[in-house]
């Protein structure tokens, strides 16, 4: 899947729309997205064709190699 930009409802903006970059599909309607430099989870609602990004509780930390 090639990354692409689209609009999404953003959790920290109380559902207001802003631009995200969809990076990867994780599962059924579940995606890894980038919102202002923060990688977080998002869901896609196929009924209204809208993404919902959770940049509060859905932040995905990068794995680091400590050893």
Feature locations, PLM:
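Mixed-charge, Lys/Arg-enriched low-complexity segments
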Residues: 2-14, 54-67
């Amino acid at each position: 899947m090639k990354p692409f930009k689209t609009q999404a409802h953003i959790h920290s903006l109380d559902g207001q729309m802003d631009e995200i970059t969809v990076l990867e599909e994780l599962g059924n309607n579940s995606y890894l997205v980038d919102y202002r430099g923060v990688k977080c989870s998002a869901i896609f609602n196929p009924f209204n064709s809208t993404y919902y990004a959770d940049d509060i509780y859905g932040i995905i930390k990068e794995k680091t190699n400590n050893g």
